[in-house]
A protein has these predicted regions:
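Nucleotide-activated donor-binding/catalytic signature segment of Leloir-type glycosyltransferases, i.e.
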Residues: 277, 286-349
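Acidic donor-binding loop of glycosyltransferase active sites
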Residues: 356-370, 383
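Conserved acidic donor-binding segment of nucleotide-sugar-dependent glycosyltransferases
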Residues: 399-400, 404-411, 420-425
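N-terminal subdomain of nucleotide-sugar transferases
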Residues: 16-81, 88-91, 164, 188-191, ...
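Short hydrophobic beta-strand element within catalytic cores of glycosyltransferases
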Residues: 384-387, 397
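Conserved donor-binding/catalytic core segment of Leloir-type glycosyltransferases
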Residues: 194, 234-252, 257-262, 273-281
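Carbohydrate-associated surface elements
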Residues: 199, 221
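A charged, aromatic-enriched C-terminal amphipathic alpha-helix characteristic of glycosyltransferases
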Residues: 124, 426-461
Length: 471
């Protein structure tokens, strides 16, 4: 009896001590060792602008986390890059591999065959890259491992670092779309999931209610110091400038934008459109996965990929860029064609300049944008947004205040909204001012990094409590 009493007393005081330690850790967190894994397609260039949305997100978060923690970023090694280097407080470790063309070919072939899961979610997808990263982590363990999308490699990371907390960063909606049993087994190796929007979070929680408490929205952000409104322009006669930023592809609804712009441009000789981004097409297996519960949207995209093998080879492999671009050009009349400018990929400085000159950003996506970085960039630049009312975009755009939202696939609604906004310059300016205020308040990288840091701390502190209680 005495032994039992003493044992209970010890357990009681151990629990109190663990809670005290946890509170101290939350009030004054000790630096954590954090590893952030980048996608295999996107090299990281120290101290410079990054290419690819996931690389941008990872780098912006890493810069802020490194102010208080030890951060290592893992990335593919591009020609001429050092194997490792240090930039300010960030350690960059790079992994070399040579099978990039193989994986691109496999992704195209899998898309044609309609394989599920898509190649991007298969165990073969850039496997040598992720296994090399896991090997590096085994030699350089961390408290928290943060990696994007490819949860098929979570078990490899867990084996490399059994005590590390594994955080999966979802930039798309795969948790609501991939095979349930496959995901359930893979999620067993994940300690927490962070997402870019409530849209992704809510759908993941609904499908996996047992993991709901471990799924968190951290959002993305924008550098409000670099993306800023331009000085007010005069009310004199000038061109009205529309802007599109993103991949020039069917899923982004650029063909719908061409139709709507052509209608407006026939009526308004003062309107022009600039499109920023590469022309290309997502693999159809990925498109069909993310739209597998949306037959209308998926059916609208099928013709761009071709039904026969010859059509597929022509459109998606040999003529991926020229095929879609030709279809876009065909939707423009001679009166409007000269006022549409495809500028391709541009530098960050040029992108900022284009935002500063724009009157309206138009993003008529057909697939459900999980977030929409161009929307945040546009709002920070004081430019209102006209976008599809789906995915995570409605979380960014305050309807009627910072822009307008229209139904997907509805060219008439897109055209009418464009006419409505372009006919009232003062309204556009008021919307732009409201967009800037909203971006400063809700859409900063600092806010996203703080949310992510809280997730990390909760995971690490809970592990400390468990170890203290056991001890």
């Amino acid at each position: 009896m005495l032994f039992r009493s003493v044992r209970h007393e010890c357990c009681y005081w151990s629990s109190l001590m663990a809670l005290a330690l946890a509170k101290t850790a939350c009030d004054d967190p000790s630096p954590m060792k954090i590893a952030i894994v980048n996608q295999p397609q996107d090299p990281i260039v120290a101290g410079e602008e990054q290419r690819g949305s996931v690389a941008i997100v990872n780098w912006e978060l890493a810069k802020r986390l490194a102010e208080r923690h030890e951060v290592t970023v893992y990335a593919p090694r591009a020609p001429g890059q050092a194997r490792s280097e240090r930039w300010k407080n960030i350690e960059i470790r790079r992994v070399s591999f040579v099978a990039k063309l193989f994986h691109k070919a496999m992704q195209l072939l899998a898309g044609r065959l309609g394989s599920q899961p898509p190649y991007i979610n298969s165990p073969l997808y850039y496997r040598e890259y992720f296994l090399q990263v896991a090997s590096e982590l085994r030699a350089h363990p961390v408290d928290v491992l943060h990696f994007p999308q490819q949860l098929q490699f979570a078990a490899d990371f867990k084996r490399a670092m059994p005590r590390a907390k594994i955080v999966l960063h979802m930039h798309q909606d795969e948790l609501a779309q991939l095979d349930y049993d496959l995901l359930r087994s893979q999620l067993a190796n994940i300690d927490s999931v962070v997402t870019v929007s409530d849209f992704v979070t809510d759908r993941a929680r609904a499908r996996f209610p047992e993991h709901a408490a471990a799924i968190h929205t951290i959002g993305n952000g924008v550098d409000v110091g670099r993306f800023q409104p331009a000085h007010q322009q005069s009310n004199g006669a000038r061109r009205m400038r529309l802007l599109f930023v993103g991949r020039i592809s069917p899923d982004k609804g650029v063909h719908l934008l061409m139709e709507a712009f052509d209608r407006v441009a026939r009526e308004r000789p003062d309107v022009e459109l600039t499109l920023v981004g590469k022309v290309g097409m997502l693999p159809f297996d990925l498109v069909s996965l993310l739209l597998n519960d949306d037959a209308d949207a998926l059916d609208s995209l099928r013709p761009f990929y071709g039904h026969s093998t010859l059509a597929w080879l022509t459109k998606e492999v040999l003529g991926q860029k020229s095929s879609y671009k030709q279809q876009l050009d065909a939707r423009l009349s001679p009166q409007s064609a000269g006022r549409v400018h495809f500028v391709g990929s541009v530098s960050l400085e040029e992108l900022i300049r284009l935002y500063s000159q724009a009157d309206l950003l138009v993003l008529p996506s057909i697939w459900r944008e999980s977030y929409g970085l161009p929307v945040a960039e546009s709002m920070a630049s004081g430019v209102p947004v006209l976008a599809s009312d789906c995915g995570g975009v409605p979380e960014l755009v305050d309807e009627g205040v910072t822009g307008l939202l229209v139904p997907r696939l509805n060219v008439d609604a897109l055209t009418n909204a464009m006419r409505e906004l372009l006919s009232d310059l003062s309204r556009l300016r008021v919307m732009g001012q409201a967009a800037r205020v909203r971006a400063e308040r809700l859409l900063t990288w600092d806010r996203s990094a703080e949310r992510l840091e809280r997730v990390y701390l909760d995971l690490v502190n809970s592990a400390s409590i468990q170890r203290a209680a056991i001890g």
